[in-house]
Amino acid sequence: LVTHRAMELGVNFFDTSNSYGDGLSEEYLGKAVKGNRSRVIIATKFARLGHLSQVRQPSRPTLMEGASRHNIMQEVEKSLRHLGTDYIDLYQAHFWDPYTPIEETLRALDDLVHQGKVRYIGCSGFAAWQVCEAMWTSRMLNLNAFASAMAEYNLLHRDIEGELVPPLFVASPCQR
């Protein structure tokens, strides 16, 4: 297996999502790392956002979608089962959900951390203002905050250079 060879070569971080292959990606990864769970870091994402399709008009999501508490609690159980583990190292909101208050999402994620089902939380595909709003909300409500923010970045998609990358650089007297 490619995953076994990657681990032999020192790879220990694996990222997937409940939406990749409708959970099959998580199942394959779970089988591949079985017996080596303590040696790997598993990151997975939640939020089935079919209602936010680029092709059709967004509609009001059901409780089975998005970043609602109900959906998060259901999806984490599915991911744990698919992955064959009792905890997820990094659990990430796959997209910003405009229909669910960020407070609801963050409270649900905070509960998962306190339950031991998730070690850290993060986000993926959020704009800079959305990351800031989530971080501010976490601080104001004394909740676990995002430990990571995944963004699309490659030769064709360099949008993050304008809003997400600049704050990453630490101010230094040498930069002046």
Predicted segments — roles?
Residues 80-101:
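Active-site groove signature of glycoside hydrolases
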Residues 57-73, 94-100:
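Active-site mouth loops of central-metabolism enzymes
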Residues 43-63, 87, 92:
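N-terminal small/glycine-rich loop or linker at the start of catalytic domains
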Residues 1-44, 86, 174:
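N-terminal binding-site loop/beta-alpha segment at the start of enzyme catalytic domains
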Residues 1-6, 65-84, 131-136, 161:
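Short, acidic/polar
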Residues 8, 30-41, 80-84, 113, ...:
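Acidic (Asp/Glu)-rich catalytic clusters
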